[in-house]
């Protein structure tokens, strides 16, 4: 009998040191993310809100916490009024891992270039987003950032 066992592509380590395998995740989350990024580029707050889970949490690189979809939409509304951020997706990896309660978590890890204007000057940053999906909605995003290399 041949068992259909997912191939591990990495390891997740919890805060208390518990290890679990990271395996290939649900590829459908890629199209959800593409719709989400397009909505950001189009300043379509209604679509963004429809993809956010009600209990959305965002962890931007500056150390703040965006708690709840309504707070996320308020944050974006102000940002979009003050600037014109644009994201270009460079790569996406669908992956999943089991949490300490034994629940399978669906993640999408993505690489984006963010072009924005700061004090009238255009900047480009590299972002990595770790995105947690629950029931087709985005429940949490961790954003990591570095300045784009000048070569």
Segments (PLM) and residue ranges:
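Hydrophobic pocket/interface hotspot
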Residues: 36, 47-49, 56, 68, ...
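A short gly/proline-enriched turn/hairpin at secondary-structure junctions
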Residues: 18-23, 57-67, 82
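Short beta-strand edge/turn micro-motifs at domain boundaries
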Residues: 1-11, 124-151
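Acidic helix-start/capping segments at beta-turn-to-alpha-helix junctions
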Residues: 52, 63-68, 90-99
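Surface-exposed, charged secondary-structure patches
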Residues: 75-119
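Sec-exported extracytoplasmic/periplasmic mature domains
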Residues: 37-42, 50-57, 61, 77-85
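Short, low-complexity N-terminal intrinsically disordered segments enriched in polar/charged residues
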Residues: 1-46, 50
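Short beta-strand segments enriched in hydrophobic/aromatic residues
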Residues: 52, 112-116, 145
């Amino acid at each position: 009998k041949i068992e259909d066992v997912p191939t591990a592509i990495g390891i997740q380590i919890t805060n208390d040191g518990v290890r679990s395998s990271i395996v290939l995740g649900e590829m459908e989350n890629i199209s959800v993310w593409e719709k989400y990024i397009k909505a950001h580029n189009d300043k379509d707050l209604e679509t963004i809100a429809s993809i956010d889970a009600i209990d959305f949490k965002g962890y931007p690189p500056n150390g703040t916490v965006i708690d709840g979809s309504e707070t996320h939409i308020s944050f974006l509304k102000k940002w979009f009024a003050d600037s014109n951020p644009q994201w270009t997706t460079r790569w996406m990896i669908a992956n999943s891992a089991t949490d300490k309660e034994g629940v399978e978590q669906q993640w999408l890890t993505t690489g984006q270039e963010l072009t924005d204007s700061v004090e009238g000057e255009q900047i480009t940053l590299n972002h990595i987003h770790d995105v947690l999906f629950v029931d087709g909605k985005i429940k949490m995003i961790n954003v990591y950032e570095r300045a784009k290399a000048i070569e």
